[in-house]
Amino acid sequence: MTQKRVLILTADAGFGHRSAAEAVEAALAELYGDQCVTKVVNPLDEADAPELIRQLEEGYDEMVVEDPALYRIAYHAMGTPLVADIVEAFATRLLNDVMLRLVQDFQPHVVVSTYPTYAQPVALAIKETTQDIALAVVITDLTDVQSLWYSRAATMHFVPTSLIRQQAYDNKIPATRVWVTGLPVHPAIARETRDPLVLRDTLGWMQEIPTGLIVASARTQQMATISRLLDRAQIVLQLAVVCGGDGELFRRLQQVQWHGPVHLYDWVDNMPQMMKAADFIVSKAGGLIVSESLACGLPMIISEALPGQEVGNVRYVVENEAGTWAPGPAEVLATAFSWLKGTPPQLDAVRANAVRLGKPRAAYDIAEGVWGLA
C-alpha cells in the first residue's frame, strides 16, 4: 500500500487556525485511515523558529484583550498592498529555514496551510526542494481576509464562502485553484445526529425548557454579566456557560447564587454535543465559533467582535438572518426575549437560516480535495 503524506501547518494566534487544521486531519484519518500519514505542526513552536516572529504570535492574546485599538490599526494596515508585501517578504525571509527543514524532514506529498503568513514561505521551501509537492491553503475567516492568504504558488485555495472566492479572483487566483467548501469544523459535528432532548439528558441538563449556550474565553469581556442577566430575566431558560479555559472566570461564576438551572464548565471537549443540545448561543464572532454554530444550525447572539475579520463574520451572520449583533448585556437579553417570547417567537426562523448557511461536512470536502492533490 502506497501511503500519502500530508503536512498541515497551523498557528496558535487565536483558536481557529489550529482547530481548522485538526478538523482536516481528523477527516483525512476517518476517510483514508492508514493510507494517509498526517502531521500538524506550528512552525513557530519549532526550536529553529526565529524568536522575533514567535514573540509576535505570543503577543496576540495580550493585544486583542488589552489594546483592541492597536489591533484594529494593525489589521487594517495589513490589508494595504504595500504593508502586505513587506510582511510577506519579512515572513518569507525569517521562516525559510524552518519551513525548508519541516518539508525535508517529513517529505509530504501535500502541504496544507491554515495561517496566512505561511503560504509564501512554504511555497519557497517547496521550490527549493525541487520536489513535486502540492500546496493547499485553507482560509479560516468568512468574509474579510487579508491578501496574505492568497498565493499564486498554491495548487488550491479552499475557501469558506462565495465572497472569499471573489476576493481570490480579485487577487489574480485562477478559478481552477479556488474551491468553496465552507470553513472546516470537526467531523464530530457531522457525526452527531442524536435528538437534542437525548443530548440534554446525556449532558445532565433539563430536557423540556429552552437552553442558551454561553461561550466565553480569556478574550471575551462581558460573559459573566450576560450570564447573570439572563439568569435573572423573566424568561424560562436554562444556561450552559463554557469558560474556555479561563479559570478566573470559572471560579468567579461558581460563587454566584444562580436563580435558575445553570451548568458551568471550565473547558469542554464535547462542544458539538452542547451546540446541538442548545437552542441558541451567545459568543464572540471568531471564525471557528461562527462556523461551528452554523454547522449545528444554532442561532447566534454575537456580543463581541474583533476589528477586521470578526466584524465581517458578524455581517455575514446578520445579513443572512442566522443571528444578531448584540454588543452589550441589555441587547443580548432583548434578543433572547424576542426569540423566545416574541409574538410570534422568532427562533425557528433564525434556526432555519443557520441550517441553510451551515457546512458541517466542509472538513470532509477539504480532505477529499487534499487527497486528490497528493
Residue ranges and their predicted role:
Residues 103, 131-133, 147-156:
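A conserved, positively charged/aromatic
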Residues 346-360:
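A short, well-ordered alpha-helix in the C-terminal region of glycosyltransferases
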Residues 359-374:
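C-terminal alpha-helical cap of glycosyltransferases
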Residues 155-217:
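A nucleotide-sugar donor-handling region in carbohydrate enzymes
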Residues 23, 27-102:
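Conserved N-terminal ligand/cofactor-binding loop architecture of enzyme catalytic domains
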Residues 276-286:
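Acidic donor-binding loop of glycosyltransferase active sites
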Residues 195-278:
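Donor-nucleotide binding loops and adjacent catalytic segments primarily
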